[in-house]
A protein has these predicted regions:
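Cationic, low-complexity basic patches in intrinsically disordered or flexible, solvent-exposed regions
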Residues: 8
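Short N-terminal edge-element motif at the start of the domain
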Residues: 12-68, 72
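Intrinsically disordered, low-complexity linker and terminal regions at domain boundaries
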Residues: 61-89
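Intrinsically disordered, low-complexity segments enriched in serine/proline and basic residues
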Residues: 1-3
Length: 206
């Protein structure tokens, strides 16, 4: 009832009005691929999303809890607040920040100039800042295990990225022949030397 015996006012809702979805930490969303593929991601802290590996089981929290993340990316909350990415499983507890904390360190690494990023050896900390990694060995371990943070300023390019690299990640991303065989001979040599330093058998890969 309205206070002090006041009258109720008519509330008019425009059915065409865009309603913002809830920002739900720990919830799981579906990203539609370009060729019918489906990718499932969980919203973690700092606008970071963990992309699940292939699922074995029903679409429920129990199945996802037993499935590891294949890769990580950061993006703004626009696609979830606007319902572009469909929520398929609600968060068991969206207030449990510690439970949905993204990995403490994720490598700052890109395949178009691997030597540059390996020389820099920088990592994204969970606080959102970029720091020098404690050692090159640790940086290489992060890269080879797929603990790389991909930062996207728009959600539209994410399906294309996943279609290209999701399968056999991180090898599919690190060993990108389009980049390795392009550019000057000096550039190509630098990239193959990085692959060797990362522990890849160049003879079998190229």
């Amino acid at each position: 009832m309205p206070p002090n015996g006041g009258k109720l006012h008519n509330i008019i809702i425009n059915k065409n009005q865009s309603i913002m979805a809830k920002y739900e930490l720990g919830a799981i969303y579906k990203i539609n691929g370009r060729s019918g593929e489906l990718y499932y991601v969980r919203l973690l802290t700092n606008d970071c999303y963990g992309v699940f590996s292939s699922l074995e089981g029903e679409l429920n929290e129990e199945t996802f809890a037993q499935t590891h993340y294949r890769l990580y990316f950061s993006c703004n909350s626009f696609p979830i607040k606007r319902g572009i990415w469909e929520k398929v499983v609600s968060s068991p507890n969206c207030t449990d920040i510690a439970r949905w904390q993204r990995p403490q360190y994720l490598a700052n690494f890109a395949n178009f100039n691997m030597k540059l990023f390996l020389d820099q050896c920088r990592v994204f900390h969970e606080d959102g800042n970029l720091y020098q990694c404690e050692s090159k060995e640790e940086f290489i371990r992060l890269v080879k295990s797929g603990k790389i943070l991909f930062c996207f300023n728009t959600y539209e390019i994410i399906p294309d990225f996943l279609m290209r690299y999701y399968k056999d990640f991180p090898n599919s991303y690190i060993v990108n022949k389009d980049f390795i065989h392009s550019g000057t001979l000096e550039y190509q040599k630098e990239q193959t030397n990085v692959l060797k330093e990362l522990g890849f058998d160049i003879g079998n890969l190229l």
